[in-house]
Amino acid sequence: MAISKQEAAWQPKPDDVPQLMDEADAGNAISQYNLGVCYAKGNGVEVDLAETVRWLRKAAEQGLPQAQFNLGMCLSRGVGVEKNVVEGTMWLNSAAQQGHAEAERILKQWWGD
């Protein structure tokens, strides 16, 4: 999983997860992203990479660049989902267009300038 060190540093307490789930279900993009991170890392829930991708996708579709980046990496590598480099690159491009530096770096590394 390609969650950056800064993003991975957030660690919910087990008691935080029910509220996070409620907020994510209500459509809060940041909570959806954070819930995806929880499922990726096993923070307050069992590790479930399919759930990681599901929540990242919901947040990415709302335009959250860190979710777009992580969804793009999951898709490009086949983590928690069938590998799809074309769709993964699309999400990385979306994140890069919003100034996500790591997405920009990876796209340059993969495809050149």
Enumerate the predicted regions with their spans.
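Alpha-helical tetratricopeptide repeat
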Residues: 14-17, 21, 29, 33-37, ...
